Amino acid sequence: MSTLACKNVAYAYEKGKGILTNISFSFESGKMYAILGPSGSGKTTLLSLLGGLDTPAKGNILFDDTDITQTGLEEHRRNHISLIFQNYNLIDYMTPIENTKLVSKVDAVPILQRLGLTEDELRRTVLKLSGGQQQRVAIARSLASDAPVIL
């Protein structure tokens, strides 16, 4: 079972204005967690750090007891983490199936259908789907990657 942990992580966009200060916790794969807080409290920033998109100002992010802040965030992101972004990051001229196959060679149709997309919707470009349908495509893409951690 994989673990993703923060140890005394801090981050600030401007010097002296810390968004995250001394954050420590541990997540185990196979479990679901929620990060809650008001707007501007650092939830998205924390997910960016966990996903290897940014580096903490201090502290460590560990994946299976390996300090990924020292060993390579890009490798960690590519091999162990799947991110579902707020803006979905879909290729709008591609279909849901094509978008899902960008991360995996698995048969995307059952995953997309399990998330409620119809045969007709699978043939449309994602630009022609509703926001909720696009979100389901982004979720399907993360599930298809089979990463131990989805953020």
Regions found by a protein language model. Name each.
Residues L36-P38:
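The feature captures the beta-strand-to-loop junction immediately N-terminal to the Walker
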Residues T125-L129, Q133-Q135:
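Conserved ABC ATPase signature
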Residues G59-D67:
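Conserved ABC transporter NBD signature motif
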Residues G51:
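Helix-to-loop junction immediately C-terminal to a conserved catalytic motif
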Residues I139:
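Hydrophobic anchor residue at the start of the ABC signature
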Residues D67-S82:
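ABC ATPase NBD coupling module
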Residues I111-L127:
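Conserved ABC nucleotide-binding domain
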